[in-house]
């Protein structure tokens, strides 16, 4: 593999990959599901070549990290891979929304790529390349020239995950919104401790909307936001109003991360 930071005038080697990852496109839709729970539904994928193979693994192996794939931007795992036609598989017993991604609906034609660690190349690029247009190309043994693919680094692997467990408690017109952050530095459940921060400081961007209009946007440095009755009156949020809260943790290098949202009726 080689990359170019000067529009393709020159390329530098960045590493080697032994074999291509199985990839293809969805034949049937993958409907929205629940994050981090077993989904017993299935979807079908057509791989780009008959020589590409998928295999079933036990649920224990899947929980340990096997059969990880990206489907339209969501990270999915599957336990069962049934060959139903040449190059066509039915995948079932799914884990959705893995590695901080969001379980969403993906239509037929969405891209599928198996994330096999032995067939991936992780490249550690300097932060100053964020937002820059780079070019990459794969060069096989004996290849004289190969096409390049352009990519602008958006820093998705650096953005903080969306918070979870958005809640509100209201009394006497005052409201307190709370949430729980997640961390790229560790996403497992640990007894007696919180997830590591993963950033130099803890900060969040909070947006409150009602009726399709943003009523208030604030930044806070703790996983809660107090919304007093006086502020509600200024914003025109009457008792019984429906509001949408959006929260994103602020990253050191990328700014606001992936947003979480929830809708509430305020007393």
Regions found by a protein language model. Give the residues of each.
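Interface-prone segments of viral and bacterial extracellular assemblies
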Residues: 1-267
């Amino acid at each position: 593999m080689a990359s170019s930071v000067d529009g393709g005038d020159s390329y530098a080697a960045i590493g080697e990959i032994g074999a291509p990852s199985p990839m293809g496109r969805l034949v049937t839709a993958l409907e929205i599901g629940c994050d981090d729970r077993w989904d017993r539904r299935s979807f079908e994928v057509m791989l780009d070549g008959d020589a590409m193979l998928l295999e079933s693994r036990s649920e224990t192996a899947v929980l340990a990290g096997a059969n990880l794939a990206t489907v339209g931007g969501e990270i999915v795992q599957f336990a069962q891979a049934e060959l139903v036609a040449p190059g066509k598989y039915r995948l079932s017993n799914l884990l959705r929304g893995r590695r901080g991604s969001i379980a969403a609906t993906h239509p037929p034609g969405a891209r599928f790529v198996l994330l096999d660690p032995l067939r991936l190349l992780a490249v550690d690029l300097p932060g100053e390349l964020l937002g820059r247009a780079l070019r990459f190309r794969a060069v096989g043994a004996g290849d004289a020239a190969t096409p390049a693919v352009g990519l602008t680094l958006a820093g998705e692997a650096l953005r903080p995950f969306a918070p979870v467990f958005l809640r509100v408690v209201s009394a006497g017109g005052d409201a307190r919104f709370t949430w729980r952050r997640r961390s790229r530095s560790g996403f497992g459940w640990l007894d007696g401790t919180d997830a590591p921060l993963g950033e130099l400081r803890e900060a969040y961007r909070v947006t409150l909307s009602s009726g399709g209009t943003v009523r208030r946007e604030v930044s806070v440095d703790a996983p809660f936001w107090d919304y007093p009755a006086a502020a509600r009156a200024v914003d025109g949020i009457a008792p019984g109003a429906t509001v949408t809260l959006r929260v994103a943790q602020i990253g050191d290098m990328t700014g606001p991360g992936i947003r979480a949202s929830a809708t509430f009726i305020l007393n």
